[in-house]
């Protein structure tokens, strides 16, 4: 019975690690698009997609002046 709880805890930890990897991957994509992760974009920035699931959901990019 103790081994069951150990395996269950290990699976929860693995799930957390894989979520962190995808967040890092999304942040790298955002950086390649010359943006940055913020919860709210400034008035002169544009939302270009998701960055992380919970903490900072938006990737912002500065607008180009015409």
Curated annotation (Swiss-Prot):
Domain of life: Eukaryota
Signal peptide residues on this chain, from the entry's feature table: 1-22
InterPro entries hit by this protein: Beta_defensin_dom (IPR025933)
Keywords assigned: Antibiotic, Antimicrobial, Defensin, Disulfide bond, Secreted, Signal
Pfam families, per database record: Defensin_beta_2 (PF13841)
Residue spans crossing the bilayer: none
Disulfide-linked positions: 37-51, 41-60
GO biological process: defense response to bacterium; innate immune response
The keyword Hydrolase is assigned to this record: no
Subcellular location: Secreted
GO cellular component, one term: extracellular region
Endoplasmic reticulum recorded as keyword: no
Function: Has antibacterial activity.
Family statement drawn from the similarity comment of this UniProt entry: Belongs to the beta-defensin family.
Protein known as: Beta-defensin 107A
